[in-house]
Amino acid sequence: MARMSTNSTTPLSHIRNFSIVAHIDHGKSTLADRLIQTTGGLAEREMSEQVLDNMEIERERGITIKAQTVRLHYQANNGEKYVLNLIDTPGHVDFAYEVSRSLSACEGSLLVVDASQGVEAQTLANVYQAIDNNHELVTVLNKIDLPAAEPDRIKEQIEEVIGIDASEAVLISAKTGLGIPDVLEAIVHKLPAPKSAGGEKAPLKALLVDSWYDTYLGVMVLVRIIDGVLTKGQTIRMMGTDAKYQVERVGVLTPKMVNVDSLGPGEIGFITASIKEVADTRVGDTITEDKRPTAEALPGFKPAQPVVFCGLFPVDAADFEDLRAAMGKLRLNDASFSFEMESSAALGFGFRCGFLGLLHLEIIQERLEREFDLDLIATAPSVVYQLTMTDGSERELHNPADMPDVVKIAEIREPWIKATIMTPDDYLGGILKLCQDRRGIQTELTYVGTRAMVTYELPLNEVVFDFYDRLKSISKGYASFDYHLEGYRAGNLVKMSILVNGEPVDALSMLVHRTAAEKRGRDMCERLKELIPKHMFKIPIQAAIGGNVIARETISALRKDVTAKCYGGDATRKRKLLDKQKEGKKRMRQFGKVEIPQEAFIAALKMGDE
């Protein structure tokens, strides 16, 4: 690690803290690369595509998952030297909390919009968050080297949809490096310098922006200093958890780690303090000095709440301990991922895991399979329901299989979301039908040029399954979708169980709306009929709500031709053999076990993907 001794902190007027706000694929990480390259943050040989996307899966999917940060030194055209702190934020809705706390560490944002595609749903969501944080915005139109780029039309669209002046938007191509110096000048002259009420003399007050686990150094914490000075050897206290630590190392990321002696007001850097687990460092928490604490914590801290739950089971039961260890390691880096042990009659031992959303679930599952070489089965994702019992008590339900007796439940409430969908108007009809089929309530519909923006209130339960895939296929991939939780509402929900040969299969039970139960049940039974191999006896597959069977399919039995050895002759002889076979089948049905192959589970859980 390079050693760089800086005893004096940078003056506030020469610091700029900014983030880049954009929809997925609009060129945010590429722009970050160019800024690093232009200011000489890394030598040419150390540059790689998407420097700040460290995880293999981030580069492969072209998305940013963890917020990253980098400190750049820039000499402006006016001869002054500035320190620019860039925080690269995720663009996806599941990581909205990572975005919100990254934004709260900055005073300004670059709004990056693709000059050929224009404003998308997540651009809106993230811009509104930036505006809520009182950010100054500099609009940047990227990809202007594309033949399809229409900068003037997109400027109008930005003014119409977002309502900010885009006449002075900086036109760039992050890929070729065109216009990057203009972006740096705009950052220096248009974005404000950080403010510090108390300056260096005040008690230490710092925002915990992010934390990650380093195998050699333990937990590393990214901090933004608001007041006071953070130095090596200080004893600090986390105001949210009241834990105390001694600072061992203070540094900045350029994106390489560089040690410094202290961090002053307005600066962003990292510290290590022999913290054992990432869970001990709550993102958004306030850090202060133990001996001379600040009077009040920073506002807006909230622990990340899991929204979607699903069971993860190893295909091979022998991998259970490996899975437990792998999840523990992932949790070190991702405090919003939670898990607890559960066992299922059908799938054996596994874990019930909580995620921020479906992309988060997919990424965790993919990282477990790829980085730790595990084969996993994921059960159907479910959301958190709130139950009011007849005795007045409240409880949360994470797993439909654990639903108490209906008689004891007074009310079931499910989470609802507010979804914003942007789509070319050719596909609007299909999208409105999809939302209506999913019990959506339309609240707004506006047109901007040839694009429509529609706002719906939807039950999250209807979205977690395959809503996003269906939306993409209806709109040929052109629609974009963003949502945030609105709250809980009472719903007419019932638990649907699937019985195979009279035995309930716990991994396939789900909570559905009463109106959709019959169709869902019939689909599931038909799907299982195709997937479960024939046995020597006939197998009924039923979908039931309580004691009422709402759908049924029967898998016919495999039959051995027992009458083959009777040549012609006596009909009673054949009858006797057939009756004997029937007896055997009856006994088999009573005691026979139906083997449900793993593939059947996996396929049945992907219901509705067609």
From Swiss-Prot:
SMART domains: EFG_C
Keywords in alphabetical order: Cell inner membrane, Cell membrane, GTP-binding, Hydrolase, Membrane, Nucleotide-binding, Protein biosynthesis
Binding site for GTP: D25, H26, G27, K28, S29, T30, N142, K143, I144, D145
Record flagged with keyword Membrane: yes
Membrane topology annotation: Peripheral membrane protein
EC number in record: 3.6.5.n1
Residue ranges occupied by any tr-type G domain in the UniProt entry: 13-195
Membrane-crossing segments per the record: none
Cysteine disulfide links: none
Cell compartment(s), UniProt: Cell inner membrane
Any one annotated GO CC term: plasma membrane
Function, as annotated: Required for accurate and efficient protein synthesis under certain stress conditions. May act as a fidelity factor of the translation reaction, by catalyzing a one-codon backward translocation of tRNAs on improperly translocated ribosomes. Back-translocation proceeds from a post-translocation (POST) complex to a pre-translocation (PRE) complex, thus giving elongation factor G a second chance to translocate the tRNAs correctly. Binds to ribosomes in a GTP-dependent manner.
Protein name: Elongation factor 4
Gene for this chain: lepA
